[in-house]
From Swiss-Prot:
This is Chalcone synthase. CDD domains: CHS_like. Keywords: Acyltransferase, Flavonoid biosynthesis, Transferase. It catalyses: (E)-4-coumaroyl-CoA + 3 malonyl-CoA + 3 H(+) = 2',4,4',6'-tetrahydroxychalcone + 3 CO2 + 4 CoA. InterPro entries: Chalcone/stilbene_synt_C (IPR012328), Chalcone/stilbene_synt_N (IPR001099), Chalcone/stilbene_synthase_AS (IPR018088), Polyketide_synthase_type-III (IPR011141), Thiolase-like (IPR016039). Belongs to the thiolase-like superfamily. Chalcone/stilbene synthases family. The keyword Transferase applies. It comes from Casuarina glauca (Swamp oak). Its EC number is 2.3.1.74. Pathway: Secondary metabolite biosynthesis; flavonoid biosynthesis.
Length: 389
């Protein structure tokens, strides 16, 4: 008779979870940030609000974003005028779009990741799907399973409505799944579409306008597994440790609420200040066991909530400007895509590292940190170890 201990030992992987492939996707509709205020105030019938438009123009100019991709086109918005108002009942129309489009965009990213991984999709044992919008039953995880033709026995986990820290959360979950199920191959998909948060401007709610200036659409997928098959799988990063914490005195700093009008977005406190004040504590807790205290010796992947967060983190930790280079690049090319952002940055970093002929996937460095920041204020900290390019 086999003991529980023996079963448990056989279930566990030998080595740490590794990222084996990354894929990304965006909707085809690309919007230039410099002309976005003209488009936005026209499509929302708000051109008479000239002062507000000037404020929005300044927000967009300061955003450090060049362009964003959005599923919502002018044609779609003309068909749904309630989505262009600030507070008009429109949840049904929004839901009808996102329950279809979120799994579809997720599939595009997943197909690219599976292709890079190079293994048959029948070897995927687990699926983690993450999105901030489109709660439905059965969920986007089920829809993606059908779209990709995954096995019906794939073990699914659906994460709805987490927000911008969740790119770190999915790595934490995928690590635990991969390391505790020998041979597991976890497909992780973050798919974000702003059709639930898009709304017209309001003079009295400038925090909502901040969201309109920053958010973009995108999906990212990764394959995570421990004990990569030699000569068959090519690991990119090892996921060494993970942590999650709620920052002190940050209640209500970032909120999102599902209403008849869609998801409303609220910024109540000094978010960049709260993050920069507390970030070193998370770094010390994560890297002290490794004997690392020089934050410039790490490669950096930080959720780009907005330029002020990056500027204040950089200043607080005395980071060299190039440390947040990959993060700022993704912000400028795509905007804030919520949970998908950090996976886009991970992809950008390994690609640039290979193009430049650097010795590791982490800009030539061995150790790195991935941060997710979002509602709560919740911070996810992931310690990564790079591998040879």
């Amino acid at each position: 008779m086999v003991t529980v201990e023996e079963v448990r030992k056989a279930q566990r992987a030998e080595g740490p979870a590794t990222v084996l492939a990354i894929g990304t996707a965006t909707p085809p509709n690309c919007l230039d940030q410099s002309t976005y205020p003209d488009y936005y105030f026209r499509i929302t019938n708000s051109e008479h609000k000239t002062e507000l438009k000037e404020k929005f123009q300044r927000m967009c100019d300061k955003s450090m974003i060049k362009k964003r991709y959005m599923y919502l086109t002018e044609e779609i918005l003309k068909e749904h005028p309630n989505m262009c108002a600030y507070m008009a009942p429109s949840l049904d129309a929004r839901q009808d779009m996102v329950v279809v489009e979120i799994p579809k965009l997720g599939k595009e990213a997943a197909v690219k990741a599976i292709k890079e991984w190079g293994q048959p999709k029948s070897k995927i044992t687990h699926l983690v799907f993450c999105t901030t919008s489109g709660v439905d039953m059965p969920g986007a995880d089920y829809q993606l399973t059908k779209l990709l033709g995954l096995r019906p026995s794939v073990k699914r986990l659906m994460m709805y409505q987490q927000g911008c820290f969740a790119g770190g959360t999915v790595l934490r979950l995928a690590k635990d799944l991969a390391e505790n199920n020998r041979g597991a191959r976890v497909l992780v998909v973050c798919s974000e579409i702003t059709a639930v948060t898009f709304r017209g401007p309001s003079d009295t709610h400038l925090d909502s306008l901040v969201g309109q200036a920053l958010f973009g659409d995108g999906a990212a997928a990764i394959i995570v597994g421990a004990d990569p098959l030699p000569e068959v799988e090519k690991p990119l990063f090892e996921v060494v440790s993970t942590a999650q914490t709620i920052l002190p005195d940050s209640d209500g700093a970032i909120d999102g609420h599902l209403r008849e009008v869609g998801v409303t977005f609220h910024l109540l406190k000094d978010v960049p200040g709260l993050i920069s004040k507390n970030i070193e504590k998370s770094l010390v807790e994560a890297f002290q066991p490794l004997g690392i205290s020089d934050w410039n010796s790490l490669f950096w992947i930080a959720h780009p909530g907005g330029p002020a967060i990056l500027d204040q983190v950089e200043e607080k930790l005395a980071l060299k400007p190039e440390k947040l280079g990959a993060t700022r690049h993704v912000l400028s090319e795509y905007g804030n895509m919520s949970s998908a952002c950090v996976l886009f940055i991970l992809d950008e970093m390994r690609r640039k590292s290979a193009e430049k002929g650097l010795k590791t996937t982490g800009e030539g460095l061995d150790w790195g940190v991935l941060f997710g920041f979002g509602p709560g204020l919740t911070v996810e900290t992931v310690v990564l170890h790079s591998l040879t390019t």
